[in-house]
């Protein structure tokens, strides 16, 4: 009893193993070519290998009555070249028309490039969507009336491919993006093809016999003339298909054809170099064995077996056998064979698969060869290679679109950030770099004749002459040619506001001057004066705008006059521009203009003396630091609008004079 129960448990725990892989003995082999040739004819054009692996099209070649054999109809109605259906969609529907391109990165699908277009088909509005992934291109046309609400870009992408899982798409801002996209889409379209042509004589059943044939029968010569034109390879200018057109190492002539703007070069076995003593004829197999599709021409009734030729590339064969057709021309029987993983390709063969020589058959045969190569690309071996190539090209396209779009927005990479200090590229940063280099060169020229005593400014734009350490540090920085003191930004809009006010000219306010030195103008009291520049004047400086902390100073501190400043008696004088804002009750910014002695505002060229850069150079004269006086009464000394406050700078002509307040 126990043994019986244990036995049943053992049976329940047993599982069935998968059937073992079939060996050659398990297959029902097809008859070999030698067995078939031992029988009575006629023989088929193609025999499947003993253990399969290929499919055949066109097995019926019985001609009951010759007059009933009809030639193929016009190729424009039934003969069509097959290619990737989505390869030309962008050129046809998007290129040169209003549309939008986006890019993104999906964790599962990889790089994505998305194109969308509003389209009107008939009287109905549609969205035409084209999504490119590393595996394929998805295309769909969706009526807007079928949507409950107008979708965003991510939702549109999910409409055409449900596997999309991204948070957002980034717009493409590069003007030449359409060229890059159409090049990627059409990389699968080829206008150059190379096909092998193998001549099989009666009784030839091996690769060595096929490649050892040198002579050409009249029927084979006629077929080659029908297939294309004979060309000399020396200095041939068309598509050469890997043949040597310079040194003649691959023969002297070949067969070439231009069909529907597609160049075709045929590798004819009898025209390739023949090597004595080489049973394999590697010079011939090197070219034909690397082709994907080959034509096998049979003079007489001898079957062709696809595995006769050992090749990893040859995936499809079109076998043509000549048949006497009387005065109307020869007849050609056609059969097609390809590996199992190659999908069926058109145009389909008629029944019976017999053609009369003529332009219709040439159209059919060349179309069949081109479509065969496109179909072979879908085989497992070529599909993996195509997928890797497509993924690499899509990644390159993604990076190009991303880099150029960032550049158009002025957002550079890490290298640009290190070079520019604050980062960023584009037009504005390029312009700033040009002005900065000009300011540094002018700084070096102006400081060559100056004393090391310099004026240091704080980040708020106010002078700090009583701080010897800070003044010393600023002086050292200014003494070195080509260097400028670095200052922190006063705020996010500091430099922009300086540019808006027009801090381009050096301004000085003098209320009272008893004995002005020779060579200097004495402006009218109460007006902002602009002193003419000398040849050795240093570069004008533009201190940053004051921060909020400095704006809340007490009224008493604003009216203090910093004493102890003197002016150099040198005729070659330089100027220091100091700008401060007097903020009103409502906090509005006040624009200041440079006013001449007659009260007429001066127009200034912001491109010539622009100092709104974030890291603008600050240079001053060789004298001591002047004092800054803020007028407590905005209407004093101002000839214009009394609502606008005025900034005045008190300067002394010599050390003996005491500064006066500009009240």
From Swiss-Prot:
Residues 566-577, 616-631 have a biased composition (Low complexity). GO terms for biological process: cell-cell adhesion; cellular response to glial cell derived neurotrophic factor; establishment of localization in cell; negative regulation of microvillus assembly; negative regulation of neuron differentiation; negative regulation of thyroid gland epithelial cell proliferation; phagocytosis; positive regulation of cell-cell adhesion. GO terms for cellular component: axon; cytosol; dendrite; early endosome; Golgi membrane; neuronal cell body. Residues 1-23, 442-646 are annotated as: Disordered. Its main location: Golgi. Disulfide bonds: none annotated. It comes from the Eukaryota. Residues 450-467, 535-549 have a biased composition (Polar residues). GTPase activator for the nuclear Ras-related regulatory protein RAP-1A (KREV-1), converting it to the putatively inactive GDP-bound state. Homodimer and heterodimer with RAP1B. This is Rap1 GTPase-activating protein 1.
């Amino acid at each position: 009893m126990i043994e019986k129960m244990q036995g049943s448990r053992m049976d329940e725990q047993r599982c069935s193993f998968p059937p073992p892989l079939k060996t050659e003995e398990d297959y029902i082999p097809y008859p070999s070519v030698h067995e078939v040739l031992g029988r009575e004819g006629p023989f088929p054009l193609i025999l499947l290998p003993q253990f399969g692996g290929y499919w055949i099209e066109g097995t019926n070649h019985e001609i009951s009555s010759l007059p009933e054999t009809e030639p193929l109809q016009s190729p424009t109605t039934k003969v069509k070249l097959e290619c990737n259906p989505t390869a030309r969609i962008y050129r046809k529907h998007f290129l040169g028309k209003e549309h939008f391109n986006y890019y993104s990165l999906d964790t599962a699908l990889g790089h994505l490039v998305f194109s969308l277009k509003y389209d009107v088909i008939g009287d109905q509005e549609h969205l035409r969507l084209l999504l490119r992934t590393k595996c394929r291109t998805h295309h769909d046309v969706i009526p807007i009336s079928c949507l409950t609400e107008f979708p965003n870009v991510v939702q549109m992408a999910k409409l055409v491919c449900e596997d999309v899982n991204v948070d957002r798409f980034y717009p493409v801002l590069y003007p030449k993006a359409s060229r890059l996209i159409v090049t990627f889409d059409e990389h699968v379209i080829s206008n150059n093809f190379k096909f092998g042509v193998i001549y099989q004589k009666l009784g030839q059943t091996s690769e060595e016999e096929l490649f050892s044939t040198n002579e050409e029968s009249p029927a084979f010569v006629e077929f080659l003339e029908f297939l294309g034109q004979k060309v000399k390879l020396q200095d041939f200018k068309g598509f050469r298909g890997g043949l040597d057109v310079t040194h003649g190492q691959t023969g002297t002539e070949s067969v070439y054809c231009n069909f529907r703007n597609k160049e075709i070069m045929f590798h004819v076995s009898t025209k390739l170099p023949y090597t004595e003593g080489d049973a394999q004829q590697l010079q011939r197999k090197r070219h034909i064995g690397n082709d994907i599709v080959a034509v096998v021409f049979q003079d007489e009734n001898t079957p062709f077996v696809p595995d006769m030729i050992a090749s990893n590339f040859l995936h499809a064969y079109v076998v043509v056998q000549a048949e006497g057709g009387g005065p109307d021309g020869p007849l050609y029987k056609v059969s097609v064979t390809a590996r199992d993983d190659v999908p069926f390709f058109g145009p389909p063969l008629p029944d019976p698969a017999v053609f009369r020589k003529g332009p219709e058959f040439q159209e059919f045969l060349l179309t069949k060869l081109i479509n065969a190569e496109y179909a072979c690309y879908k085989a497992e071996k070529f599909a993996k290679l195509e997928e890797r190539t497509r993924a690499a090209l899509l990644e390159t396209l993604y990076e190009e679109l991303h880099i150029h779009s960032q550049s158009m927005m002025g957002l550079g990479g890490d290298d640009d950030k290190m070079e520019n200090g604050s980062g960023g590229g584009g037009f504005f940063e390029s312009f700033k770099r040009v002005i900065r280099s000009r300011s540094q060169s002018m700084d070096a020229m102006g400081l060559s004749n100056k004393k090391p005593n310099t004026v240091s400014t704080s980040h708020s734009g106010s002078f700090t002459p009583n701080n010897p350490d800070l003044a010393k540090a600023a002086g050292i920085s200014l003494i070195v040619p080509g260097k400028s003191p670095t200052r922190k930004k006063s705020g996010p809009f500091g430099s922009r506001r300086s540019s808006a006010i027009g801090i381009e000219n050096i301004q000085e306010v003098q209320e009272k001057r008893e004995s002005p030195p020779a060579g200097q103008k004495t402006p009218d009291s109460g007006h902002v004066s602009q002193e003419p520049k000398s040849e050795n004047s240093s570069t004008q400086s533009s201190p940053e705008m004051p921060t909020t902390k400095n704006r809340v100073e007490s009224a008493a501190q604003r009216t203090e006059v910093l004493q102890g400043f003197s002016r150099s008696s040198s005729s070659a004088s330089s100027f220091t521009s100091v700008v401060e804002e007097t903020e009103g009750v409502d906090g509005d910014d006040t624009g200041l203009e440079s006013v001449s002695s007659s009260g007429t505002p001066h127009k200034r060229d912001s491109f010539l003396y622009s100092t709104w850069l974030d890291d603008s150079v600050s240079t001053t004269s060789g004298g001591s630091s002047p004092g800054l006086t803020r007028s407590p009464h905005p209407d004093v000394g101002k000839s214009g609008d009394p609502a606008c406050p005025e900034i005045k700078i008190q300067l002394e002509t010599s050390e003996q004079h005491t500064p006066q307040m500009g009240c």
